[in-house]
Amino acid sequence: MQRNPNPNNLPVELNRTSLYLGLLFVFVTGVLMSSYFFN
């Protein structure tokens, strides 16, 4: 991911994208774990 020729081009956009992906991953993992525990 460090092969971007312009690393300072969209730092805020990349940070927001990584943050949203992290929250989505945690949410999906929580749903899967809750389904396993409740079943």
UniProtKB/Swiss-Prot annotation:
**Known SUPFAM superfamilies for this protein?**
Photosystem II reaction center protein L, PsbL
Main subcellular localisation: membrane
Pfam families xrefs: PsbL
Any one GO BP annotation for this protein: photosynthesis
* Alphabetical keyword list: Membrane, Photosynthesis, Photosystem II, Reaction center, Thylakoid, Transmembrane, Transmembrane helix
Query: GO CC annotations?
Result: photosystem II reaction center; plasma membrane-derived thylakoid membrane
Question: Transmembrane stretches, by residue range?
Answer: 18-38
Spell out the subcellular localization from the entry. Cellular thylakoid membrane
Q: How does it sit in the membrane?
A: Single-pass membrane protein
Transmembrane: is it a keyword of this entry?
A: yes
Its biological purpose is as follows: One of the components of the core complex of photosystem II (PSII). PSII is a light-driven water:plastoquinone oxidoreductase that uses light energy to abstract electrons from H(2)O, generating O(2) and a proton gradient subsequently used for ATP formation. It consists of a core antenna complex that captures photons, and an electron transfer chain that converts photonic excitation into a charge separation. This subunit is found at the monomer-monomer interface and is required for correct PSII assembly and/or dimerization.
Name the HAMAP family for this protein: PSII_PsbL
User: Which NCBIfam families has this protein been placed in?
Assistant: PRK00753.1 (NF001972)
Q: What is this protein called?
A: Photosystem II reaction center protein L
- UniProt organism field: Parasynechococcus marenigrum (strain WH8102)
Q: What is the lineage of its organism?
A: Bacteria, Bacillati, Cyanobacteriota, Cyanophyceae, Synechococcales
Its gene name is psbL
